[in-house]
Amino acid sequence: MVRVGLQISATLENVDKLETSHPDYSFFLKLKCSNCGEQSDKWHDITESERVQQDSRNAAGFNFFMKCKMCSRENSIDIVDKSNAPYTADDSGAFKTIVVFECRGAEPVEFSPRVGWRVSSAENGQQFEEVDLSEDDWVEYDQKNNNSVGIYEFASKFIKLKK
């Protein structure tokens, strides 16, 4: 079992906090089988609030379960409880871990941010729900503070973590 952290980096303009709408946020990931190295071409969605029970060895189920098409190995991924963290203005421009995945047989290799982010603008400004970061940049107008808010140069990477 390997723990993998999803790190993001972005330049924030008049934004105090960027976070997923966990536990209902769907992380869209491309995965690689740790056994044979086969990498999926399709996006798989993993949501903390959803569990699948494909394996009789784990009655609680998993957040994600798949069988490798190449080697037939059964792989699963869970989102580590309470591992979700916001990306804040203090983090702007640097990579920060926002969620940790517990991986058994499959590892994430690519992340697509898509819709479902929450943005809190600076100085107790407007809250934005269901923000779509699929274009890697997002701009809106904060009517409460009469200024623009934005997220630019969104990037992500995965890092292996020690337990």
UniProtKB/Swiss-Prot annotation:
This is UPF0587 protein CG4646. Zn(2+) binds at C33, C36, C68, C71. It comes from Drosophila melanogaster. Requires a bound zinc ion for normal folding and solubility. One of its GO terms (molecular function) is zinc ion binding. It comes from the Eukaryota. Keywords: Metal-binding, Zinc. The keyword Signal does not apply. Belongs to the UPF0587 family.
